[in-house]
Amino acid sequence: MIIETLSTFPDMYESVMGASMMRIAQEKGILDFKAYDLRDWTHDRHRTTDDEPYGGGDGLVMKCAPIFEAYESLCAATGKGSIAAPAEPAQGEGASDVAGQMPGDSSGAGQAPGEGSASAAAEQTLSDVSAAADRAASKPYTIFLAPQGRRFDDACACELAKQDRLLFICGHYEGIDERAYTLADEVISLGDYVLTSGELASMVVIDAVVRKLPGVLGAETGALGESFADGLLEYPQYTRPATFNGMEVPAVLLSGNHGAVDRWRREQSLERTYRLRPDLLEGMELPDADRAFLQSLSTEGRR
């Protein structure tokens, strides 16, 4: 799978993607990850990616022009031809903006000394894009992270894991120009709270998706026993020693009876879900033995 991110802070991914399972997935060739800097698709000396909001208000809004240009470059990078670097503005001509310049916008200034370095960076970026995308057969499935999006869950992670190529476009500051959302195949939200940036949210989604890929956890069935894999919370886990500070490991786990262990784990998953996340049980199809066990828990609660 190819996973790409487009943001103003690509360095934020280094520690997460360079450690643990994310690193292993890349070393095994299961994952090809690349974080792109949105500034490589800007054309002013300050490499501006944001501006004041129309209508006034606090904060800065990410401009849609660099996002569209970057998206088009990434979509073109399918290994079917070379990619031209972003065009530099002519003398006295600024980068085009979808709805015109804001009052006081400095993006219309002519090319300043030193701007060639931005072009060189863009060329290198596009070279990286082309190399990574040689294994991509189609344009990326594009995801924005925003509060108005679909609530992310394990089912969503499984769906995304079936894609060949994912592109996460990450907001920052006050948000993203609404017109950029026309590029989205899907908008995802982690929950009803605010984060500093879309980079943080994308890391959570990427981790959840990558661990679903065959071979990442060491076996095809590696993720099947995790929480939410079958709609239930995971059963309690224990390791040595069998006794610690007077707390004992359940005897059934020491019995060697695999059938009894399996049933204990199933009942623990059911009970934990019943007590902590009963909403997950709504509409779930369960075998008769599971329903009888849940009924016994309900009866206990009424005593």
What kind of region is each of these model predictions?
Residues 176-227:
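Structured adenosyl-cofactor binding patch, chiefly the S-adenosyl-L-methionine
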Residues 87-90, 95-126, 130-131:
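Long, intrinsically disordered low-complexity tandem-repeat segments
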Residues 4-6, 34-36, 141-143, 166-167, ...:
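Hydrophobic/aromatic beta-strand patches that form the interior of the parallel beta-sheet core
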Residues 200, 212-255:
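Internal, active-site/partner-interface "lid" segment
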Residues 1-75, 259-274, 278-282, 303:
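N-terminal nucleotide/polyanion-binding subdomain common to many enzyme families
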Residues 63-92, 123-166, 177:
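S-adenosyl-L-methionine/SAH cofactor-binding core of RNA-modifying enzymes
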